[in-house]
């Protein structure tokens, strides 16, 4: 019984002790090469889907709008709609913050 009384404060301390999360599990901004390195780390041999568009393949909403005969005022509305629809990895992890668990969604 006396032994239990001596260890009771230690047991209480261990029960209340909460380790800090490691940096790997903390949500953080990941941009550019840091984002790619994190994807390699998380996905490993599975790999991840990444096909960058060349400058010519990137859609230009202004050119597309002019081809459709729209007015320049409509271009701002279109740009806002496109910005709202973007929910890619850069928006999720660079513009915003994400965890390594969220990065797993982009693995093959």
From Swiss-Prot:
SMART domains per the UniProt record, alphabetical: IlGF
Alphabetical GO biological process terms: cellular response to glucose stimulus; D-glucose transmembrane transport; glucose metabolic process; insulin receptor signaling pathway; receptor internalization; response to cAMP; response to cytokine; response to dimethyl sulfoxide
GO terms under cellular component: collagen-containing extracellular matrix; cytosol; endoplasmic reticulum lumen; extracellular region; extracellular space; secretory granule lumen
Residue ranges of the propeptide: 57-85
Signal peptide: 1-24
SS bond list: 31-94, 43-107, 93-98
Annotated keywords: Carbohydrate metabolism, Cleavage on pair of basic residues, Disulfide bond, Glucose metabolism, Hormone, Secreted, Signal
Database matches in InterPro entries: Insulin, Insulin-like, Insulin-like_sf, Insulin_CS, Insulin_family
Subcellular location: Secreted
Molecular function terms, GO-annotated: hormone activity; insulin receptor binding; receptor ligand activity; transmembrane receptor protein tyrosine kinase activator activity
Record Gene3D superfamilies: Insulin-like
Pfam families for this protein: Insulin
Functional note: Insulin decreases blood glucose concentration. It increases cell permeability to monosaccharides, amino acids and fatty acids. It accelerates glycolysis, the pentose phosphate cycle, and glycogen synthesis in liver.
Quaternary assembly: Heterodimer of a B chain and an A chain linked by two disulfide bonds.
PANTHER family to which the protein is assigned, alphabetical: INSULIN (PTHR11454:SF9), INSULIN/INSULIN GROWTH FACTOR (PTHR11454)
Family the UniProt entry places it in: Belongs to the insulin family.
Protein name from the UniProt record: Insulin-1
Species for this entry: Mus musculus (Mouse)
Phylogenetic lineage: Eukaryota, Metazoa, Chordata, Craniata, Vertebrata
């Amino acid at each position: 019984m006396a032994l239990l009384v001596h260890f009771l404060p230690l047991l209480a301390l261990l029960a209340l002790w909460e380790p800090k999360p490691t940096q790997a599990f903390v949500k953080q901004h990941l941009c550019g090469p840091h984002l790619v390195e994190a994807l390699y780390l998380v996905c490993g041999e599975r790999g991840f889907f990444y096909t960058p568009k060349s400058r010519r393949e990137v859609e230009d909403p202004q050119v597309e709008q002019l081809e459709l005969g729209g007015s320049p005022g409509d271009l701002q509305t279109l740009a806002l709609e496109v910005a709202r629809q973007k929910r890619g990895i850069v928006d999720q992890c660079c513009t915003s913050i994400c965890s390594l668990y969220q990065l797993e969604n982009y693995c093959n």
